[in-house]
Design a protein with these regions (language model features):
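A short loop-to-beta-strand structural motif that recurs across blades of beta-propeller domains
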Residues: 52-57, 105-108, 158-161, 216-218, ...
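Loop/turn-rich, solvent-exposed surfaces of beta-rich toroidal or solenoidal domains
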Residues: 209-220, 236-268
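Beta-propeller domains
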Residues: 42-66
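Beta-rich, blade/repeat-based domains predominating
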Residues: 24-39, 43, 51-52, 73-93, ...
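Short loop/turn segments immediately following the C-termini of beta-strands
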Residues: 45-47, 98-100, 144-147, 165, ...
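Beta-propeller fold detector
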Residues: 20-21, 65-72, 117-124, 171-185, ...
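A short helix->beta-strand "capping" segment at the edge of beta-propeller domains
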Residues: 16-26
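Short loop/turn segments that connect beta-strands within beta-propeller blades
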Residues: 59-63, 110-115, 164-168, 221-226, ...
Length: 318
């Protein structure tokens, strides 16, 4: 059973928390990661379509975010909707392009002189490309909905997919029978339908993902070939997390979770303790990223990032 720990420094955290306003060209901040130059990188799907889907940078803590580049649009839809992002070891950026009508893509973007040099499609035909992380030459991508699966009970099916970083133009069918689907889950909550959403990896090679609708969080062990060989539910349905969305792990093995409908930022320690770093004051928090001694949280329902200082925790992030 998880132990709940409300931090003694919670009041200090709230008092010292800051808000960063994104530029007008960002209407929906979401996925985040840190690049090899130590900059915070932010994906913005811009759901209202008044602006193109883009990637922004924050070069220093509490600085001013700037647009880095527009994500090359899908030819069929005419737009890009970047959500989850992560970097590979050679500095390439992997982007979940969350499209409707099974037009989603996983992109690999390489750079020259800080500008896009090449944009390639790793996988296509995705129902709901959401989060992505790189681990040992593999890319682990969540699909919160597998719309192709029709269940008699109406429950929603979701999946964790694995691709090789060298894959290009892989077409998926969006069912657990896909060769690339290494873990699937069913959401039982009839009020909140989304399934596997956020994804994170730690230094020991474990993978974490959460069922958004049920409030469950999984710790997964991949085998030598990258496929999942063991799963453990570390947060249970109806428990502490209402809707676990984006997540990340720091170098101390702490797991941070943005709880969108719970309006909270949680941290699960390696010993299983659950801390609420902040409860309230977000606008549909979707993604956390540990950077330079603080947790930066994307307000998916707004146009800002919340900066929550940490109390003596490791400041590197995976």
């Amino acid at each position: 059973m998880n132990r709940i720990l409300f931090l003694a420094c919670a009041a200090v955290l709230s008092a010292n928390a800051k808000t960063i306003q994104m530029p007008p060209t960002c209407t929906t901040p979401d996925g985040m990661c840190v690049d090899s130059k130590g900059r915070l990188v932010i994906a913005t799907p811009n759901n209202d379509r008044t602006q193109p889907g883009a990637v922004f940078r924050l070069d220093k803590p509490c600085g001013t975010p700037v647009k880095w580049f527009d994500v090359p649009p899908c030819k069929e839809s005419g737009y890009a909707s970047p959500m989850g992002i992560c970097f590979g070891p050679a500095g390439e950026l992997y982007v979940c392009d969350n499209q409707k009508d099974s037009k989603g893509r996983l992109l690999c973007i390489t750079f020259k002189d800080d500008k896009i040099d090449k944009c390639e499609v790793v996988a296509e035909g995705l129902d709901n490309a959401n989060g992505v992380k790189y681990l040992n030459g593999k890319l682990y991508l969540t699909q919160a909905f597998l719309y192709s699966v029709k269940r008699g009970d109406g429950a929603a099916t979701s999946g964790l997919y694995m691709f090789s970083a060298s894959d290009r133009n892989v077409k998926v069918c969006n069912t657990p029978a896909d060769e690339q689907c290494v873990f699937s889950d069913v959401t039982r909550n009839p009020q909140i339908r989304g399934g596997l959403n956020g994804v994170a990896v730690d230094a020991k090679g474990f993978i974490y993902t959460g069922n958004y609708g049920d409030g469950r969080v999984w710790k997964l062990m991949p085998g030598a070939d990258g496929r999942i060989i063991k799963s453990e539910e570390i947060l249970h349905a109806g428990g502490l997390s209402v809707t676990p969305d984006g997540m990340c792990v720091d170098c101390s093995g702490n797991l941070y979770i943005a709880d969108m409908r719970g309006d909270a930022l949680q941290r699960i320690l390696p010993d299983g303790k659950v801390e609420f770093l902040r409860k309230g004051g977000f606008v549909r928090p979707s993604e956390p990223c540990v950077w330079k001694g603080a947790v930066y949280v994307a307000n998916y329902g707004g146009t800002t990032l919340e900066v929550v200082p940490l109390c003596g925790s490791g400041c590197c992030q995976r």
